[in-house]
Amino acid sequence: MKGTELSYGDLEGFFKGLLENNVVDALVIPRRVGAGVSYMLVRDKDKITSPESVIFAPSFGVNAANIVKGWLIDEKVGIVAKPCETRAAIELVKLKQLDEESVLLITVDCAGAYANEVYAANYAAIGDQVDSAKIKDLAGKGISIRDACAICDNRLADVGDIALAQANGSKVVVAGLTEKGDAALTAAGLTLEDKELDRAAENQKIAAEAKANLDALPKVDSEAALEEFLRDCIVCKNCRDVCPVCYCKECFFDQPIGNPTGGDLLNLAEARGAIAVPTNQLMYHLTRVYHVSTTCVACGACEDACPKDIPLTRFYPVLTRKVQEIFEYVPGKDVKEPLPFTTYEDEELEECLR
């Protein structure tokens, strides 16, 4: 691959160069808000200050892909995001919800993240960056990363157009992952050279750690367990609204048949003798998990958004991962790989039909 090494302090000039040289028309980039982190959409390069202190911050609020969902205009936007966010953006391209030619995906390494409120409350202890050793030490003090991050096996910046890899101590390796990425780096004023970025051993370690954490998660493995798991759900649909790959223009559960009220509710009770309320609680989640079964990137935004603190990571990512394994599909890995449900083969999945 082609790339270069920059000091952390040089990253500000790099991001400003993307705007100044018209590589992108706007940039979605993290910013510091008090002790926490949020995103901003930048048009004026002078609004970017000290990005090195925040782009690797182990904090997760909203999935950046959700910000650019529906970006189907000619103006080009760059996104500085974690791997799960980039992967969600790639799935949106496949779903025709994001124009591939109008987005530049800049992915940063991620060791794992804390819910934004946890990060802000413990910023003094967590700081601007973490590694696996620090995460383990903080967990011993009761400050734990999100379950979605603990079971994630795609933490390195190896998807998207440009990688910002923390692979060399005080330096950041800035490398193009696609021809578009190479062209963007050159246009931004960087001089590229051949870079060897072998992270196989690191990926193996991450995969082993993620599997161990996944195996340790409490299981929702029966109808009774699922009913108990979803007992407190108020069907607010927050999990749908923050999901980067849930995009239906008209949701069934916003329609009268999917969200009955008044007389319709009474008629259902009359027909069945009794109904659980809120209605369609189980059907809502089963429908959603089917809809995102191949495109879920396990970012955990659904769990973060739940007002009842239901640990949805134990449901959505766990179930969708099983479907993805059946199809041998990794969402967001390759923008050219077709979505499993959009392809057909005469002989496929025979082992699942036996």
Predicted regions and their residues:
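Generic structural signal for well-ordered, non-membrane alpha-helical segments
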Residues: 4-11, 236, 299, 312
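Residue-level marker for well-ordered alpha-helical positions
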Residues: 12-13, 227, 237, 290
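Ferredoxin-type iron-sulfur electron-transfer modules in oxidoreductases and energy-metabolism complexes
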Residues: 207-231, 248-354
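Local cysteine-cluster metal-coordination motifs and their immediate loop/turn environment
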Residues: 82-87, 143-156, 231-252, 293-309
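Iron-sulfur-associated redox domains of electron-transfer enzymes in respiratory
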Residues: 1-226
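Alpha-helix boundary/capping residues
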Residues: 93-96, 233, 322
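Alpha-helical scaffold segments in carbohydrate-active enzymes
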Residues: 114, 235-238, 325
